[in-house]
Design a protein with these regions (language model features):
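Bacterial N-terminal signal peptides that target proteins for export
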Residues: 1-8
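Bacterial N-terminal signal peptides
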Residues: 8-16
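Well-ordered alpha/beta subsegment
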Residues: 118-142
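Short, compositionally biased
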Residues: 103-119
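Loop/turn positions that initiate beta-strands
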Residues: 90-91
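N-terminal secretory signal peptides
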Residues: 25-74, 79
Length: 142
């Protein structure tokens, strides 16, 4: 009796760790704004899968509130893991109520509801402090 139960627990643990490993690796994305190139890791969720299916994708992003670059899709993307949370500089998020795809480049410590985390830019996000509205291209990194 003890061995089958232990085997079942070990199997469940292995599944959990493999899922975490896949999520931790994520999807590598190349982001280009003007002549600046950044890399990001996008998380595996429904929102990300919907976005990546459209790559390569160039979006006219608007500088909003001195903290974020934003593009509003005409139609909603799936967002089944939204939450109220803060954000970090470099986060790439989707704000479900206005179909907003957002790069957070400055911090104001606001907590935002209905936020779906999409990914994280590794470095260089500070360039958006000086670009104003700009076309940004998203594609798979090689």
């Amino acid at each position: 009796m003890f061995k089958p139960v232990m085997l079942a627990l070990v199997s469940l643990t292995a599944v959990s760790f493999s899922s975490l490993g896949a999520e931790a690796e994520g999807i590598r994305v190349k982001i280009t704004a003007g002549d600046q190139v950044m890399t990001a890791t996008f998380y595996d969720n429904a929102t990300t899968r919907a976005l990546v299916s459209r790559f390569p994708l160039t979006l006219p992003m608007e500088d909003l509130y001195g903290r974020e670059m934003c593009y509003r899709f005409p139609d909603a993307l799936p967002a089944n893991e939204t939450q109220t949370s803060g954000y970090e500089v470099g986060d790439v998020v989707y704000w479900a109520p206005r179909h907003s795809f957002v790069i957070m480049y400055e911090q104001n410590n606001e907590r935002i509801g209905n936020l779906q985390k999409v990914g994280r830019i590794h470095s260089g996000v500070g360039i958006f402090r000086h670009t104003g509205n700009i076309d940004v291209t998203f594609e798979m990194a090689h």
